[in-house]
Structure formats: C-alpha cells, structure tokens
Design a protein with these regions (language model features):
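Short leucine-rich amphipathic alpha-helices used at interfaces
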Residues: 7-8, 46, 94, 126-127, ...
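Polyanion-binding surface elements
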Residues: 9-29
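C-terminal regulatory/effector modules of DNA-binding transcriptional regulators
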Residues: 153-305
Length: 305
C-alpha cells in the first residue's frame, strides 16, 4: 500500500497549491516546515507530489495561529500535541526570536550591508508566512528606523536604504507570484498623495498567498480612475491603502463619489482606516484596519456577504 492509499481514510487529499491558498502559507514554507521541523507529513503520489489531508490543513492553520501569537518553532510541536495555555517563558523565548531578527536587521541597515539583510529576509520568509514576518519583523523595523531618525541616532539614508531594499524584494515577489485562474480579484492602490507603498505591497502579497488575485497599481492613485480600471480588469473589489491622513476633500467628496459610481465594494486599509473610520463609513466604504491577517479575513467576509 503506498502513502496515498494509506491516507484515504482521512478523506479528500489536496495538492500543495490548494493548501497554500487555504492557509496563506506558500509552498516553499510548507516544504520547509516538513523538512526542518516535521510539523506535517503529507502523502505522496506515485510521481512524488505532496498530497495533504484535512488533518494536515488543520495542523497548518494551528501552526500559523501559534506563530501569529509569537510561539517559537521549538514550542509549536508541544503546543500542537497538548494545546497547553501559553506561558510567560514560552512567550519570552518567542519574543527573543523576533527581537534577534530585528536587531540583526538593524545592524545590517546601519552598515548598509545588503547581503546580510538579504540573508535575514530570505531566512525569515522561508520559515514564516509573509503576514507573520510583516507583523513581527518588517513593520517594526520601519517603526524603529523612524524612531532612530527622530532621535537623531539614525539617518534618512538608512530609511531610504531599507525602503529601496524592500521595494526591490517585494516588487520581484509581486512580479513572479504564481498565477492562479480562480479567486476573487482585487484592484489594489494607494490613496492620492500616498507615496509609501511598502505596506500596500506586503498586503498584496499576503492576500495573494490567501488565494486572492491581485491587480497592483501602486502609489498615489487618483480615485477617479479606479472604477474604469476595475471594470477593465474584471475585479471584484477596489482596495485602497492609506497610512497618512488624506485631504478632507478626498474623504468628504472623492471617496463617496467613488463608492457611488462603483458596483464593486470599496475597501480602505492602513492607518487611515482606523483614524478616519467614521468618515469612511459615511462614504459607504469598508474600513479593514492595519493588521494584515485580520484585514484579509474581514475583506473575505465583505466579498462573501
């Protein structure tokens, strides 16, 4: 009896791309979890392709949930088997993992050491889903660099160095992402006047890993062009990212005009979706916050209402 037959009693088996879309964990990371930590043991076809049971999928989702809480890989197997309450010692070890990543990355940025920064970035993304890396490493790094500049410990050059590094990395990932013929299609852009698009790119990659199709327009996009663009691309929703407060005219007139003229849901993410939640609601748009995983979950609810 081969491994595929041995798992028939578990129900349907799913290929790795299906599991990646269901869980938000890309295939490279799934294979790393299997190889390095033995967290999952998928069946194999005669040609060696991985097949995952529903039990495997549930285990992957549990792993993501634990990682999102900051639990380290050394503790995850125990948590999966026993599900004990998270304790202070476990949390401290987990925080140490991300603290170490961030400290090493800061040193690489201070030294303008692109090779070391690249090694850290690739290692983190080989082990963790991009939304977990974003929350625990990349966004805190951006905050730390801003604080260094504000306190005169750092320089604008450091921020520009890291910003250029991230745009190159994320742009390449967006360009080379695996094409999928199904899934809701999102038109993603930044609010007019918004030139910081790293958060928008991170959101787009995480949404893609969760099975959405992405049409990415980038920074400083006039709202008046979004409806026609969404129609031409046959999108299911318009997603706008905004981290700086938009001009009042945009919230009071342009955004309501966009919602009124659009047959697609208009969704706002980023800091503006928190600070200006009431104005966004009055305009008829949906605010989804700043935490990527929760934003994607909320967006999925909006599109399936």
């Amino acid at each position: 009896m081969d491994s595929q037959e041995a798992t028939k009693n578990q129900g349907d088996l799913f290929p790795i791309r299906t599991v990646a879309s269901e869980t938000g964990v890309n295939p490279v990371t799934l294979r790393a979890w299997e190889r390095r930590y033995g967290l999952i043991k998928p069946a194999r076809t005669a040609k060696g392709h991985r097949l995952y049971s529903q039990q495997d999928v549930d285990r992957i989702k549990q792993t993501v949930s634990l990682l999102d809480r900051g639990i380290s890989f050394s503790q995850i197997s125990k948590n999966l088997e026993t599900q004990p309450p998270e304790n202070t010692e476990t949390s401290a070890r987990s925080c140490d993992t991300w603290t170490a990543y961030r400290a090493q990355a800061i040193m690489a940025i201070i030294r303008f050491d692109e090779n070391q920064l690249n090694l850290l970035y690739n290692e983190a993304l080989s082990l963790y889903p991009i939304d977990v890396v974003t929350e625990h490493m990349l966004l805190p790094l951006l905050v730390s660099l801003g604080e260094r500049w504000a306190s005169s410990d750092g320089s604008i050059a450091e921020e520009h160095f890291f910003g250029a590094f991230m745009r190159n990395k994320l742009g390449a990932r967006l360009h080379h992402r695996h094409w999928t013929p199904t899934g809701k299609k999102l038109l993603v852009s930044c609010m007019p006047g918004e030139h910081h698009e790293i958060g928008t790119m991170l959101f787009s990659l995480a949404a893609h890993d969760h099975g959405f199709r992405i049409v990415y327009l980038g920074a400083d996009m006039p709202l008046r062009e979004l409806v026609l663009s969404a129609k031409r691309a046959a999108c299911d929703a318009i997603v706008i990212s905004s981290s700086i407060a938009p001009h009042q005219h945009i919230l009071a007139h342009e955004l309501p005009g966009l919602v009124k003229s659009s047959r697609y849901p208009v969704i706002i993410g980023g800091q503006t979706s928190i600070r200006c939640a009431d104005a966004i609601k009055r305009a008829g748009a949906h605010a989804i916050g700043t935490r990527i995983r929760e934003s994607i979950r909320r967006m999925d609810e909006i599109l399936h209402d």
